[in-house]
From Swiss-Prot:
<feature type="binding site">
    <location>
        <position position="147"/>
    </location>
    <ligand>
        <name>ATP</name>
    </ligand>
</feature>
<protein>
    <recommendedName>
        <fullName>Probable serine/threonine-protein kinase At1g54610</fullName>
        <ecNumber>2.7.11.1</ecNumber>
    </recommendedName>
</protein>
<feature type="region of interest" description="Disordered">
    <location>
        <begin position="409"/>
        <end position="474"/>
    </location>
</feature>
<dbReference type="GO" id="GO:0005524">
    <property type="term" value="F:ATP binding"/>
</dbReference>
<dbReference type="Pfam" id="PF00069">
    <property type="entry name" value="Pkinase"/>
</dbReference>
<feature type="compositionally biased region" description="Low complexity">
    <location>
        <begin position="9"/>
        <end position="40"/>
    </location>
</feature>
<feature type="region of interest" description="Disordered">
    <location>
        <begin position="526"/>
        <end position="572"/>
    </location>
</feature>
<dbReference type="InterPro" id="IPR008271">
    <property type="entry name" value="Ser/Thr_kinase_AS"/>
</dbReference>
<comment type="similarity">
    <text>Belongs to the protein kinase superfamily. Ser/Thr protein kinase family.</text>
</comment>
<dbReference type="InterPro" id="IPR011009">
    <property type="entry name" value="Kinase-like_dom_sf"/>
</dbReference>
<dbReference type="GO" id="GO:0106310">
    <property type="term" value="F:protein serine kinase activity"/>
</dbReference>
<feature type="domain" description="Protein kinase">
    <location>
        <begin position="118"/>
        <end position="402"/>
    </location>
</feature>
<dbReference type="GO" id="GO:0004674">
    <property type="term" value="F:protein serine/threonine kinase activity"/>
</dbReference>
<feature type="compositionally biased region" description="Basic residues">
    <location>
        <begin position="554"/>
        <end position="572"/>
    </location>
</feature>
<keyword id="KW-0808">Transferase</keyword>
<feature type="compositionally biased region" description="Polar residues">
    <location>
        <begin position="74"/>
        <end position="83"/>
    </location>
</feature>
<keyword id="KW-0547">Nucleotide-binding</keyword>
């Protein structure tokens, strides 16, 4: 093919231009501005002229996605202000501007789903900030879980809290961590649905079922998956901050996934910042959080994991406190009271209030003496008062508990159970209460022995997150004013001295106030029997006098407690 020469526009007439254009078109050449480029090989005809222009004007060339070379005379908006570019693309794709501002790059590559493409089947979970539904994806036919995040308005604090879960989930990718599959948004309202894989069970629902009894190898299988998921979270700089049974989901294949990252946060151990201590459900809350620490790390998740391990082996929660004072008391009696150095180096806002008068001796090995011997060192480490002594998730996976026989079974080898979640246990208990109330209304005043088993044990409810305390208090006041509401009524934590109460949407089988104040569980061979020859024995449950739902003391002694009303609880 012959050479193509450039020409000066000033010396070329209109007729000559037309003639040149027609001749070049027939020879496969296209004119672009002042340059001619061949279609076949993209050779630039007037390179010399371009170089002169570049020297004169200082313009720079950039290569486009099509391979052409063009001059750029304006700053690239993508490079000068990438956040504006992303926001524009996201809004054009259908994302609400308030969500784009809050989540930034986390939305890149996604397209918002519409609510009418899902069909709700059943409500499967409820919390302080969200409801979870079983739903069908009408586009794929797949069963999914929809988590509806509730927030009253588009205040920056509310939106930031909601967006944090999305940002955290986009950081994580592990078989034992729930995966965010999509988002359902609305341009007209402050509603947002998070789309997850549907899971048939949660650990709290299975553990509370009277027909479920985990063997040692099954406990190892579940705990190995839990700690593996935590190891991944911590390696990605994520603290979960609410590890408990109802947040550990299990599918039909026995795979456990850590879920509900609503209280999770991103942390950097090399650049620490103050964080709220009002996290983690009370029964699984580490002592440093109860004492008001704002400088903490992975140890709070490992403490919760230790509580879960002991609970699976014992068949019930090991420290079911009702208030922060009582929870600390139970921790001191089981794990021992902190040393003097602990109080000196720790910056605790409540240290002076909750410091015990007399030191407590650590009694984990004595209390859990009937547990499998290989489990005791791991429980002892995870339930250390000093956060540093809890080590790491990686160290826990290398402990004797996982490297000794019987080894952990494979997830697929776990028994198959009918779908069971914490909310199912709550519904069963509510139905039992309704039947009791109906019998009482019909004049059935005869006292009946109440059969109590693991399905009727109390489950803790999460306390409010301090970062959204104003919104939570507002919901509580509205609930209290609505006489027709079926929700539990309770005072804000900062008004009741940190009492656990019964938060909105809490799942529990019986009111924790029915548990006598001085009750301390005893973990004997009846709690966990790992003999190969004998079947597991029945779990012991409390059958003593019931406490009054308000005063928390025995009904028989109700009249004698008026003089002690209002006295402050003190850790002895």
């Amino acid at each position: 093919m012959g050479c193509v020469f450039g020409r000066e526009a000033a010396t070329t007439t209109t007729a000559e231009a037309k003639q040149a254009k027609s001749s070049k078109a027939s020879s496969g050449v296209v004119v672009v501005g002042e340059s001619s480029v061949t279609k076949s090989n993209g050779v630039i005809a007037d390179d010399v002229e371009k170089k002169k222009n570049e020297e004169a004007n200082g313009d720079k060339e950039r290569k486009s996605s099509k391979g052409d070379r063009r001059r750029s005379t304006k700053p690239n908006p993508r490079l000068s202000n990438p956040s504006k570019h992303w926001r524009g693309e996201q809004v054009a794709a259908g994302w609400p501007s308030w969500l784009s501002d809050a989540c930034g790059e986390a939305l890149n590559g996604w397209v918002p789903r519409k609510a009418d493409t899902f069909e709700k089947i059943d409500k499967i979970g409820q919390g302080t900030y969200s409801n979870v539904y079983k739903a069908k994806d009408m586009l794929t036919g797949k069963i999914v879980a929809l988590k509806k995040v509730r927030f009253d308005n588009l205040e920056p604090e509310s939106v930031k809290f909601m967006a944090r879960e999305i940002l955290v989930l986009r950081r994580l990718d592990h078989p034992n961590v729930v995966k965010l599959e999509g988002l359902v948004t609305s341009r007209m309202s402050c509603s947002l649905y998070l789309v997850f894989q549907y899971m048939d069970h949660d650990l709290a629902g299975l553990a509370s079922s009277p027909v479920v009894k985990f063997s040692e190898s099954e406990v190892k299988c579940l705990m190995r998956q839990l700690i593996s998921g935590l190891e991944h979270c911590h390696s990605r700089g994520v603290l979960h901050r609410d590890i408990k049974g109802s947040n550990l989901l299990i599918d039909d294949g026995g795979v456990l996934k850590i879920a509900d990252f609503g209280l999770a946060t991103i942390f950097d151990p090399n650049h620490k910042r103050p964080m709220t201590s009002r996290v983690v459900t009370l029964w699984y809350r580490a002592p440093e959080l109860l004492l008001g620490a704002t400088d903490y790390g992975v140890g709070i998740d490992l403490w919760s994991a230790g509580c879960i391990l002991a609970e699976l082996l014992a068949g019930r929660p090991i420290m079911p406190g009702r208030t922060e004072v009582e929870q600390l008391h139970k921790i001191y009696k089981l794990c021992g009271s902190p040393s003097e150095d602990y109080w000196k180096k720790g910056k605790f806002t409540h240290g002076a209030i909750y410091k015990p008068r007399e030191p407590y001796k650590r009694s984990i090995r004595e209390t859990f003496k009937d547990f499998p011997p290989s489990s005791l060192p791991l429980i002892d480490a995870l339930l250390s008062i000093e956060p540093e002594d809890r080590q790491t998730a990686s160290a826990a996976l290398k402990s004797e508990f996982f490297t000794s026989e019987p080894y952990a079974c494979e997830p697929a080898d776990l028994p198959k159970y009918p779908p069971s979640k914490e909310i199912d246990a709550k519904r069963r208990d509510e139905e039992t209460r309704r039947q009791r109330a109906a019998s009482k209304a019909q004049g059935d005043g005869a006292r009946k022995n109440r059969h109590r088993d693991r399905s009727n044990r109390a489950l803790p409810a999460p306390e409010a997150n301090a970062e959204l305390q104003s919104n939570v208090d507002r919901r509580r006041l509205i609930t209290h004013a609505n006489a027709k509401s079926k929700s539990e009524k309770f005072p804000p934590p900062h008004q009741d001295g940190g009492a656990m109460g019964v938060p909105l949407g809490a799942s529990q089988h019986i009111d924790p106030t029915f548990i006598p104040r001085d009750m301390v569980p005893s973990f004997t061979s009846s709690s966990f029997n790992f003999s190969k020859d004998e079947p597991p024995t029945q779990v012991q449950t409390w059958s003593g006098p019931l406490g009054h739902p308000i005063t928390g003391v025995s009904r028989k002694k109700k009249d004698n407690t008026k003089s002690s009303k209002g006295k402050r609880a003190v850790v002895a």
